Every structure is written in structure tokens, then in C-alpha cells.
Amino acid sequence: MFQPQKHTLVWPTKSDKGEPIAHVHYQPLTMGQHRTLSEQHKNNDTQLLRACISASTGLSETEIKSLVTPDYTSIQNQVLELMNATASQLIEGEFDSAAPTLLIPIQSDSGQQKTQYTLKPPTVATTDLMDTHANEWERTIFISSSCTGFSQSELERLSLSDWNQLQERLIDFLQQPAAYFHPKT
């Protein structure tokens, strides 16, 4: 399970309420959060990055702007690293790509906590059906749901690292021949 990480500010600052900020904690965004922020800041990468940093750290825009550049750069790098990592890169110990453990468990639509899922390769019929969807996002959600059994809302609750792990494996399923999946001896 993921433990929120922190950056100790070299140059402490103050919160919007005037309280000292000496440490900034950051945690993974969910796929749904990232998707929403991406839609809100479509044409401005700087605003998107700041919004992601704010969502990950809980810092307001004003608090982010009060950081000195070296502290901001450290936080930015850590948040970007977390956003781009796969769960297997962050989970300690062995990682089963056929039944991945979630870096951050989610609550299913039925209210149960999900800590892992079983991933099954799509059939040819499923990939044909995927191709009938109107755009890339709909195809991605369809194939992700078909191979995991997660609903769209459950997929949106996945941490970005869990989502990245899933997408990496789905790309393997869609592009690699069967020999790629044989157990290594």
C-alpha cells in the first residue's frame, strides 16, 4: 500500500491562513481527477501541471506561487514522477501482472474494497467491438473495463499509477504475440 510522501521545504512558506508550511505531502491523483483536470486545462500545460500539483499536495494556487523556485521544482518533479510511474514501480516485492495488486485500494460500486484485480486478455470479438467506439477515450474505457471487470466509475477511482500499469499491460495484450506471455523459465 502507498504511503503519502513528503518534501521538506528548504525555504518554508505560509499557508493562505498565515500558518507556517515546512513540509508538503503529496499523493497520487486518480485517473478521474487527472482526466477532469486535463479537460479543464486543455490548452495550457502550465495550468494543468499546477492544477495537478495542487490536487496532489493540497496546496492552493496562491500557496504554490509563494514557493521558491527550487522547492517548487522539487515538488513538481516528485508529483510528475508519481503521475508517470506504474504501480509495479512503486509496490515493494513481487508484482503479479496477471492479478495486479492495487497501489491504492478502491471502493467498488457495490461498496466492497478492491485491493487487486484479475486481468484477462481480450478476445478478437472484444477488440472488434472496441474498434466500433467513436473515439480513443471510449475505446480505452471499453477495453479496460472488458479486461478487468471494472466499471467506468471504478476505473476513474484508480490511482494514476494503477491506471498506468493497466494501460501498459493492455498495450501488451493488443500488440504482442502469444510467445511474449509464456512464463520465463
Question: Residue spans of the language-model regions?
Answer:
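Charged interaction scaffolds used for protein-protein
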Residues: 1-43, 55-57, 61-132, 153, ...
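A detector of tandemly repeated sequence units and domain arrays
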Residues: 51-52
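Mixed-charge, glycine-accented linear interaction segment located at domain edges/termini
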Residues: 136-154
